[in-house]
């Protein structure tokens, strides 16, 4: 079975922007309380679009409460892998998987898995901000209401708590009833993070969350990731080598659907085990 043009487009990552290849190595990071246990475990996990194998037999442990960056050239399968973790790829008719992918020991693709509950526990923020055409308040309250929360006082508390976690409360607290589409791009992206946090996920998936933002807004998102680190397991797809080195504890490097290397970020950027990893992070190919 061959992929349609639309499915091929969906399976490929957004083309990388031209960027410097100077690598910034972060200083030693503080320890994470309660972290270190595998939160997501992939074993011989593959993803297909028809007959096309987009992700090939990945074996990896994603550790709880740490930040894991996923890097690699366009079309390498990094976003496809990320989307598989909360089953966003189910929306593509020809997509199917082999092997296993587990979350807290449970098979993500098991027959008894509740996809709605799974996506509550594993939230996702996309490349482009996608606020609903509703008020700021209703954007954040949408998820809790969907899951049965109707008490006005409780909803107000959740909205404030989520906006504070997303470092947005001080900027919007006096205009919660205004349309969220009136926010700046960076504010909209933080709103999307707050909307995800409102349903209290365990894992936060970020698919190139700053690629459409200016440097100032990008810095705020990176600061936010550091604030959330230790409270959530975070996975971020990025084309930006410096961003990966700044925000992550661990890095996964994909090439043509294969997980080439998965290591601590400092180790991967300073002493990669695989020659292909070294060639990529030093800009010999992109």
UniProtKB/Swiss-Prot annotation:
It is found in: Cell inner membrane. The keyword DNA damage does not apply. ATP binds at residues 72-79. GO terms for molecular function: ATP binding; ATP hydrolysis activity; ATPase-coupled phosphate ion transmembrane transporter activity. Its EC number is 7.3.2.1. Keywords: ATP-binding, Cell inner membrane, Cell membrane, Membrane, Nucleotide-binding, Phosphate transport, Translocase, Transport. Coiled coil: none annotated. InterPro entries: AAA+_ATPase, ABC_transporter-like_ATP-bd, ABC_transporter-like_CS, P-loop_NTPase, PstB-like. It comes from the Bacteria. It is a peripheral membrane protein. One of its GO terms (cellular component) is plasma membrane. GO terms for biological process: phosphate ion transmembrane transport. Belongs to the ABC transporter superfamily. Phosphate importer (TC 3.A.1.7) family. The complex is composed of two ATP-binding proteins (PstB), two transmembrane proteins (PstC and PstA) and a solute-binding protein (PstS). Part of the ABC transporter complex PstSACB involved in phosphate import. Responsible for energy coupling to the transport system. This is Phosphate import ATP-binding protein PstB.
